[in-house]
């Protein structure tokens, strides 16, 4: 339930679907397991997994959803070798090379032959929508997977007006300024990990861990025109994370002081515990994202189309 990696996107028009509307649309595109000759399926599952029975779980106006993708794993090297075998056999039997169309047919036939024996990989991706705060937050370390979820949601809703938020001043410039000026605003404090790039396409990359980011050694990297592309931060004595220069948020860790707020929930009541955890987590993340964006002079409503 606790998100560990975040990509968040802002709506360019207010999110107009109610919980009931969203449930109806998602229920029309539920995940189903793969058949023996199918290569992939992507659909919605219960937001609370085996403990729930709805595609949308709501808490304090935030809508939790979950997409599942199942893919058959077909090693490209195996397919390539089998195509080569068929091409060689054709040359031996007919004394000619295979055409492009024939190679494509070989690949299709081989894939169909291998699918029933292939292993499957299943990936679940949670997200929540906060209409009040005008954002959708996706629990993924991969931007591609985050955008896959957005594409699936757009497909079932017919439209999904969202976009990344981009600051006027590049994020890496602001992050570098934090170290140069030895200060951050708001409730943020520096951690002890960072990654620096040197200017130029073939510039050096420096990664530091367990190190004071205001030390003389770090200053020497900054003086050598290296800029920050990742930096460890803490927020409001509530969570730690790695901020990337595309505003992706990695390795989110909520501190015990947050988890302990739900210690009074009966651990045997799984649904109540999941509901309380989601309400707590989404509330904290909403505040966190709003305050993080403020460090870049942005708001979650910046992209809303003006009437």
UniProtKB/Swiss-Prot annotation:
May be involved in recombination. HAMAP family: RdgC (MF_00194). Keywords: Cytoplasm, DNA recombination. Belongs to the RdgC family. It is found in: Cytoplasm, Nucleoid. It comes from Colwellia psychrerythraea (strain 34H / ATCC BAA-681). It comes from the Bacteria. The gene is rdgC. One of its GO terms (molecular function) is double-stranded DNA binding. This is Recombination-associated protein RdgC. InterPro entries: RdgC. GO terms for cellular component: bacterial nucleoid; cytoplasm. The keyword Cytoplasm applies. GO terms for biological process: DNA recombination; regulation of DNA recombination. Its main location: cytoplasm.
């Amino acid at each position: 339930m606790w998100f560990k990696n975040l990509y968040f996107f802002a709506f360019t028009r207010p999110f107009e679907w109610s919980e009931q509307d969203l449930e109806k649309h998602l229920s029309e595109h539920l995940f189903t397991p793969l058949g023996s000759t199918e290569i992939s399926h992507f659909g919605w599952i219960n937001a609370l997994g085996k403990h729930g029975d709805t595609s949308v779980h709501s808490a304090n106006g935030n809508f939790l959803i979950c997409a599942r993708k199942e893919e058959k794993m077909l090693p490209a090297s195996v397919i390539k070798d089998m195509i080569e075998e068929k091409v060689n056999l054709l040359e031996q039997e007919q004394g000619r090379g295979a055409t492009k169309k024939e190679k494509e047919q070989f690949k299709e036939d081989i894939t169909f032959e291998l699918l029933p024996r292939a292993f499957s990989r299943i990936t679940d991706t949670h997200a929540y929508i906060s209409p009040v705060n005008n954002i959708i937050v996706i629990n993924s370390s991969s931007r591609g997977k985050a955008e896959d979820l957005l594409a699936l949601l757009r497909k079932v809703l017919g439209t999904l007006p969202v976009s990344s938020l981009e600051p006027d001043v590049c994020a890496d410039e602001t992050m570098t300024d934090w170290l140069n000026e030895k200060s951050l605003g708001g409730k943020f404090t520096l951690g002890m990990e960072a990654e620096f790039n040197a200017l130029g396409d073939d510039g050096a990359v420096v990664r530091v861990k367990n190190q004071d980011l205001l030390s003389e050694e770090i200053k020497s990297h900054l003086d050598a025109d290296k800029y920050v592309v990742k930096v460890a931060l803490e927020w409001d004595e509530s969570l730690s994370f790695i901020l990337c220069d595309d505003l992706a948020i990695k390795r989110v860790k909520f501190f015990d002081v947050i988890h302990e707020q739900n210690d009074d929930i009966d651990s045997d009541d799984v649904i109540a515990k999941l509901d309380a955890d989601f309400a707590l987590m989404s509330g904290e993340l909403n505040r966190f994202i709003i305050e993080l964006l403020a460090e870049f002079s942005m708001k979650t409503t910046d992209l809303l189309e003006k009437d």
